[in-house]
Amino acid sequence: MVASAEADVPPPTMLVKIASAGLSACLADIITFPLDTAKVRLQVQGERPNAPGVKYKGVLGTIATVAKTEGPLKLYGGLPAGIQRQISFASLRIGLYDTVQEYFNAHRKTPATLGNKISAGLMTGCVTVFIGQPTEVAKVRMQAQSSLHWLKPRYSGTYNAYYVIVKTEGFLGLWKGTSLNLTRNVIINCTELVVYDVLKEALVKNNVLADDIPCHLLAALTAGFCTTALASPVDVVKTRFINSPPGYYPHVHNCALNMLQKEGLRAFFKGFVPSFLRLGSWTVIMHVTFEQLKKELMKSRQTVDCAT
């Protein structure tokens, strides 16, 4: 990513980037979690058409229905797993992006190429999926389950979800849907980081906007929309497959085929609006906070170094 416009602030270190990415991602997750819960509920709806339960309509309608029938706190069901996911996953995939990009471009004296940026996004996206997958499985299942009186929840809490999954599905149950999540996160990581990076760089270099909050907002919002559009079909299949009981879908492709046959192509874009609202707002909050936090941490470090 392009360097900060404030010349007196030293470039952020790798640890500062990782810490800033983790903290920013956690903040973004806390703020946007109800939207993510609405997205998951809309995506799994239709999986079992005859099952008893509330029917959800639209983003705000889903949020209102969950809050009314299950209580407002249910919108944050699975938040501990979500925070754990951001700490173990987002901190590394975003925090290491610049470092990996610099590694791929080490033999050149010119700025990083588009190929370098894509390669960095691919690598950080792939590696961190395996680290964060258990938290993703627990998060999705906690968000998908309803606590209405006629539906017995599968899990009493996030840590109970980890325990029950290992007990009933084996240790590898925590990595269910890894191949799908790998595909999804490679798409998300490359699109989000590369679009943000390229657009931000273009805006600054062409003197359209300074390297500050308005520039970060525009670049992040554009990256969020592009990411949602490309990742939505994989995201829906991933959510359905991860949330399904053992044996319900023999394979990932069986889940996708079942959706296509029973619900049509539109099923692959279920929850698109909440996906964009969530991913778009998450991307904006994360990147704007990330950019500012990096600067402030380096300023603080510079002040401490000067004082000593």
UniProtKB/Swiss-Prot annotation:
Post-translational modification remark: May undergo sulfenylation upon cold exposure. May increase the sensitivity of UCP1 thermogenic function to the activation by noradrenaline probably through structural effects.
GO biological process: adaptive thermogenesis; cellular response to fatty acid; cellular response to hormone stimulus; cellular response to reactive oxygen species; mitochondrial transmembrane transport; proton transmembrane transport; regulation of reactive oxygen species biosynthetic process; response to nutrient levels
Cross-referenced Pfam families: Mito_carr
GO molecular function, one term: oxidative phosphorylation uncoupler activity
Membrane topology category: Multi-pass membrane protein
Topological domains, Mitochondrial matrix: 34-74, 135-179, 234-267
Sequence ranges of the Solcar repeats: 11-103, 112-202, 211-296
Catalytic activity from the UniProt record: H(+)(in) = H(+)(out)
Binding positions (fatty acid 16:0): K57, K270
Description of how the protein assembles with itself and partners: Most probably functions as a monomer. Binds one purine nucleotide per monomer. However, has also been suggested to function as a homodimer or a homotetramer. Tightly associates with cardiolipin in the mitochondrion inner membrane; may stabilize and regulate its activity.
Function comment: Mitochondrial protein responsible for thermogenic respiration, a specialized capacity of brown adipose tissue and beige fat that participates in non-shivering adaptive thermogenesis to temperature and diet variations and more generally to the regulation of energy balance. Functions as a long-chain fatty acid/LCFA and proton symporter, simultaneously transporting one LCFA and one proton through the inner mitochondrial membrane. However, LCFAs remaining associated with the transporter via their hydrophobic tails, it results in an apparent transport of protons activated by LCFAs.
This protein's name: Mitochondrial brown fat uncoupling protein 1
Record organism: Suncus murinus (Asian house shrew)
Name of the gene: UCP1
